[in-house]
Curated annotation (Swiss-Prot):
Interacts with the U3 and U14 snoRNAs. Associates with pre-ribosomal complexes. It catalyses: ATP + H2O = ADP + phosphate + H(+). It comes from the Eukaryota. Residues 72-246 form the Helicase ATP-binding domain. InterPro entries: DEAD/DEAH_box_helicase_dom (IPR011545), Helicase_ATP-bd (IPR014001), Helicase_C-like (IPR001650), P-loop_NTPase (IPR027417), RNA-helicase_DEAD-box_CS (IPR000629), RNA_helicase_DEAD_Q_motif (IPR014014), SPB4-like_CTE (IPR025313). This is ATP-dependent RNA helicase DBP4. Residues 683-694, 732-741, 751-761 have a biased composition (Acidic residues). Residues 701-711 have a biased composition (Polar residues). ATP binds at residues 85-92. One of its GO terms (biological process) is rRNA processing. GO terms for molecular function: ATP binding; ATP hydrolysis activity; RNA binding; RNA helicase activity.
Amino acid sequence: MAKKQKHNTQQRKLIRERDSQKIKDLETKVEEYNPKIAKANLFQDLPISEQTLKGLKEAAFIKLTEIQRESIPLSLKGHDVLGAAKTGSGKTLAFLIPVIEKLYREKWTDMDGLGALIISPTRELAMQIYEVLSKIGKHTTFSAGLVIGGKDVTFEKERISRINILIGTPGRILQHMDQAVGFNTSNLQLLVLDEADRCLDMGFKRTLDAIINNLPASRQTLLFSATQSQSLDDLARLSLTDYKQVGTMEVLNANSSSATPESLQQSYIEVPLPDKLDILFSFIKSHLKSKLIVFLSSSKQVHFVYETFRKLQPGISLMHLHGRQKQTARTETLDKFSRAQHVCLFSTDVVARGIDFPSVDWVIQVDCPEDVDTYIHRVGRAARFGKEGKSLIMLTPEEEEGFLKRLKTKNIEPSRLNIKQSKKKSIKPQLQSLLFKDPELKYLGQKAFISYVRSIYIQKDKEVFHFDKIPLEQFANSLGLPGAPKIKMRGMKSIEKAKELKNTSRQLLTLAKANDEGDVIKENKPEVRTRYDKMFERKNQTVLSEHYLNVTKAQAHDDEDEDFIMVKRQDHELNEAELPELLVPTSKRAQKKALSRKATLASNGNPTKVKFDDDGKAHPVYELEDEQDFRQNGNSEKQKEEFLSKEAELMAKVDVEDKQVAKEKRQEKKRKRLEAMRKEMEADMEDSDYEDEPVAYLGTGNLSDDMQSGADTEDDSQDERQPRKKSKYADSSEDEEEEERTTERDRIIEVEEPQTLEDLESLTANLIGS
């Protein structure tokens, strides 16, 4: 944010009038702009503000790409946009520029709250969007914030109410909607979904639906991805009815060109599963002067391959990245890999979407991706912005035919490569030696084996993935294991639930267990009993046992307790002849039958529940009509439609009531939290002055600086405020002043009011003497 200069009232008035006139002229240009006639090639040809143009120029963004040329004018005019383009085509700027321009033309300030919400499926992509926004928007006065998992929630809560443009992942955004008191989305202008097809799939379905329910329906929505979804259900969830498609034909149409960049050289090799690690190690050894990304299917495999290859020392720097790492480690790895020239990165699909790595030479897919969309996003890490790149995928003989057929539907036909036997090197003996010496490596190998087999088991495309054809023993030997570990396979329902829980915030899962007042009820889990606890809980079985002591104690106090609980008065005697005779079973068989519910029902029949009408006649709870009575009411299809429509109206009415009740509960929770915060602030104000922290505006610094400030705040927030201590040694000047005040007090003479002349004379004499 540029430094503000002080102006007098007249100057400020002129500046406001000038800015208002600029905004009016800009809106006129946007309405009159026709992309078919203008055919803009540069950003300066578009109807955008001077501040945005200045930021784009300083960030070296000058020429427009095809997706930017087609989508930005439509977004500036307020249309909902469904955009798709090849990887590395500049989709990030295609939605960031309309976000800045929309808020600029609306004269958005800090007091207006949240104006734009940008949702990304991964933390790394959200961080990249935040960095680009900081570069191109540093000459504007909007405040931007980044909320992702792995960061201090308290630090984000304190500042989220003053953010104009919020970028984050679905789980953390929903967590702030439930917990942050000042987070208000009622004034939202734009919703942006980057990698929209991933955000709309099953993994984020419930989270995204909950977010959208809290957003106003009058917002503008922008969807961007390299593989776009045109499902009517997905678009209806986002309230998209009248939207504009941009660039989707070349990506989704089967008769169009390939969905991958033209400068990307794609190839594949047929490799048996037990030989994959040998081929991978040999490939890395022969490409030591390259920048490589190696994709594997699970984090366990990434960890195992990284640790084993690191000990084998192929001669190139090795890095690994997966979703189970802490956020600081993931950020450092991304930064190092981006700056390195010759390096190999082992990764899962956590960086398969949207991440812009400079100058990647090779993208290697050791494991077959789950679908063609994942393949397109993986290979899209190379050949970005027209640069050259290469990709290689390893397919087993069982996967080759089916997956190549899937690729052909998108006009992707990779060329087949043959392996030179002279370049191939087996590392199985070295792996067996490493796993024999290091038990931790052996454990990682077992986990990698299990995770790969489970990943094949849960795949939906059974034409490509054949679980029953996996050579388990040979694959285990290729990892250096002495044998194939035993694996327990769960049902598909539990697998889908695990996928859903994987993308759900732990804080949200905790809040789901809260009661109506918002208090989280902690489960009383049994504590772990150690052998020392068991030792102290042992009881004596000899003369020192509890039973023996009770007996001896009772005998010792027999005399004292002689009159305790004695009958003092008898009302009457009970006559056994007057008691009613109960039906007592006469034999064991009758007793067993009386206690058996099944036998009782067999003899007496099932109980029937009836209801009585106004006339007192009994009717069964569920009365079924005869076929003749049913046909008298009309056609069966018509009755079915009437019943469904009636039930649909009832459910819609109940759904509105349920949503209103849920909304009132959320508001009540927020109100209580706000009241608690207000009381806490009032208590703090009595002890010390309140120090407000400034908002982090665009362009205030690097992303790393903003994140470091968040970490510092986290440490500071944990420290308690210490009361101000008095100085151990008093100042000498203070002592002198105290002595002077004491002397003056001693000189004061207290007398009664004089009544006579003699009293006045004595008072005068005393004053003269003193």
